[in-house]
UniProtKB/Swiss-Prot annotation:
Species this protein is from: Bordetella pertussis (strain Tohama I / ATCC BAA-589 / NCTC 13251)
Disulphide-bridged cysteine pairs: none
InterPro entries named among the record's database cross-references: ApaH, Calcineurin-like_PHP_ApaH, Metallo-depent_PP-like
Class of this enzyme: hydrolase
Ranges annotated as spanning the membrane: none
Its job: Hydrolyzes diadenosine 5',5'''-P1,P4-tetraphosphate to yield ADP.
Name of the coding gene: apaH
Catalytic activity entry: P(1),P(4)-bis(5'-adenosyl) tetraphosphate + H2O = 2 ADP + 2 H(+)
Family the entry assigns: Belongs to the Ap4A hydrolase family.
EC number(s) recorded for this UniProt protein: 3.6.1.41
CDD domains associated with the record: MPP_ApaH
Record keywords: Hydrolase
Highest taxon of the lineage: Bacteria
Name of the featured protein: Bis(5'-nucleosyl)-tetraphosphatase, symmetrical
Length: 277
């Protein structure tokens, strides 16, 4: 496909900053461009419904991977999980076009690879190369797109197993895949996921490292693009790009043109206090 690719970080229901970002001359003038969204389109911000409608209307110009908040919306719609006090999903759940929006969301990928860039919401396990990541993401995608998608969502909650084994089956297998792609931040050097620690970057306890610094990570030969980690903020290395710059927390919404790493940001109003989600 032709056109520049602009990758956008976590929107989290902040439609006004998204509209401002897309109207930026550098982006709006790029008429053949395509847009990648690194997940968490919804929740915590005030306009999740407007965000979904706008991104859905982009059609084939848009590729959006599922984040943990997007999966939470699916679970809330399915009756698997009740919204919490900090959620801002009621407008979507009660919308007249909710069925269409939920069906569109169910058919989003959990991983996307193109032109040397692998996009996921949170990260990948060190043992997984690009092919493995796409294959495992595909297993979950198939379940979410199938007739029993509500039952599939019941299996995704929990922190265990914390590591990958090829012989995992059923709910354990799905849970590891979802947790790695949509929730991971820190790991042990051997690749065990750790979800209890919520500290500022660089202040994590001995024995824990960011998932992208686990030794011998199999995706280090490509660039992994992700969001999810607002306290980490903007990170640009040859092998990883983090684009969650805390839009909903009063930070910025960021877009990066992949081929030359041109960065465009818009400042955002603070809608909620950071709480590690």
């Amino acid at each position: 496909m032709k056109g520049n690719i602009w990758t956008i970080g976590d929107v989290q229901g902040c439609c006004a900053p998204l509209a401002e970002l897309l109207a930026h001359p550098e982006i709006a003038g790029d008429t053949d461009s395509r847009f990648w969204f690194a997940g968490d389109l919804v929740n915590r911000g005030p306009q999740s419904l407007a965000v979904l409608r706008r991104i859905m209307a982009m059609g084939e110009r848009c590729t959006a991977v599922l984040g943990n908040h997007d999966l939470h919306l699916l679970a809330a719609y399915a009756g698997v999980r009740k919204p919490s006090k900090s959620d801002t999903l009621d407008e979507v759940l009660q919308a007249p076009d909710a069925v269409d929006l939920i069906d569109w969301l169910r058919f989003r990928p959990l991983a996307h690879y193109e032109a040397g860039h692998l996009m996921v919401h949170a990260g990948v396990l060190a043992k997984w190369d690009v092919a493995k990541t796409l294959a495992l993401a595909g297993e979950v995608e198939q379940a979410l797109r199938g007739p029993n998608w509500r039952k599939a969502l019941q299996k995704m909650y929990g922190n265990e197993p914390a590591t990958w084994k090829d012989d995992h089956t059923g709910g354990k297998r799905m849970r590891v895949i979802i947790n790695a792609l949509t929730r991971i931040r820190l790991c042990t050097p051997s690749g065990h996921m750790e979800f209890a620690t919520k500290v500022a970057p660089g202040a994590w306890p001995a024995g824990l490292v960011p998932w992208f610094d686990v030794p011998n990570r199999a995706t280090r030969d490509v660039t992994v693009v992700f969001g999810h980690w607002s306290t980490l903020g903007l990170l640009m290395r040859p092998d990883v790009i983090c684009l969650d710059t805390g839009c909903v927390w009063g930070g910025a919404l960021s877009a990066l043109r992949l081929h030359d790493r041109k960065l465009v940001q818009v400042k955002c109003k603070r809608f909620q206090d950071p709480n590690g989600d």
